[in-house]
Amino acid sequence: MKSASKQKIIQPVDKNLDQVYQVSTMVSLLDGIYDGDFYMSEAKEHGDFGIGTFNRLDGELIGFDGEFYRLRSDGKAYPVQGSDCSPFCSLAFFRPDIYHEIKQRMPLEAFEEEMKRIMPSENLFYAIRMDGTFKKVKTRTVELQEKPYVPMVDAVKSQPIFDFNDITGTIVGFWTPQYANGIAVSGFHLHFIDEDRNVGGHVFDYEIEECTVQISQKLNMNLRLPNTQDFFQADFNKHDLAAGIEAAEGNPE
C-alpha cells in the first residue's frame, strides 16, 4: 500500500496588498490630458491610501486610513465624493513594513537621504507616511483648467503657493524608481494635509520638527490606462520627460 504523499499547501499572495495601483501616467498629464474616467467610488477597491489629482486639475488628492480629500487651489481640504473623477492617481493598501522616528529638526534634503538609507532598495516602490510637527511645509495646488487645455508646464505657472509654519499634520506619498519615471513621478512625490483636515496641497518643500515615518514596500505596479479618445490620440513622444516633470512637480523657485 502506497503511503499518501504530503503536498505543501502554498498560500496565495494577495497582490492587492503588494502593489501600487496606478491610474494613467504622468506623461499624459504633461501633455494636458486632464480628463480621466476613474471615479473615486472605485478608489477603495484598490487602496486606502493615495495621492493624485482630479479632472480639469481641480485639486490635489490625498488619502490615508481609508479617508480621501480634495485639496483645492484655495488651499482648503474637502471630502472626496464618489462622483469625483481622476485623470491620474496612485493608490495602495498601506501596511507598514518599516517604522522610523525623527526626533530632531530635519530639512527635506536630509530627510530624503535618511529615507534612502533605510529603504531596502531604491529599485522598489514605497508608500510613505509621515505624521508629526513640521517647522514649515510649502505646498501648491494648480488652479482648475478650462478647455482648450494647456500643457502642465504652462498650467503650473499660475499655481497658488501656500506656506504653512509650525504645523502638525500628515505627509503621504510614494517613492517611485527612476526606471518608472513618466508612469509616475520618480523619487519622492508627496502631498500634505493638516491634523484638522482643513488645509494642504502638493508638497515641494518642508522641514521636519519631529515625526513618525511609516514605509510600506510594494513589489508590483498595476497600471490602468484611460479608455478615452484624448488618451488614444495623444503623442507622448514629443516631451523632454525629465525636464517636464521637474517643471510641473518640482520647486518653482
UniProtKB/Swiss-Prot annotation:
One of its GO terms (biological process) is acetoin biosynthetic process. Coiled coil: none annotated. The keyword DNA-binding does not apply. It comes from the Bacteria. Keywords: Acetoin biosynthesis, Decarboxylase, Lyase. Pathway: Polyol metabolism; (R,R)-butane-2,3-diol biosynthesis; (R,R)-butane-2,3-diol from pyruvate: step 2/3. SUPFAM superfamilies: AF0104/ALDC/Ptd012-like. It catalyses: (2S)-2-acetolactate + H(+) = (R)-acetoin + CO2. The keyword Lyase applies. Its EC number is 4.1.1.5. GO terms for molecular function: acetolactate decarboxylase activity. InterPro entries: Acetolactate_a_deCO2ase. Converts acetolactate into acetoin. Belongs to the alpha-acetolactate decarboxylase family. This is Alpha-acetolactate decarboxylase. It comes from Bacillus licheniformis (strain ATCC 14580 / DSM 13 / JCM 2505 / CCUG 7422 / NBRC 12200 / NCIMB 9375 / NCTC 10341 / NRRL NRS-1264 / Gibson 46).
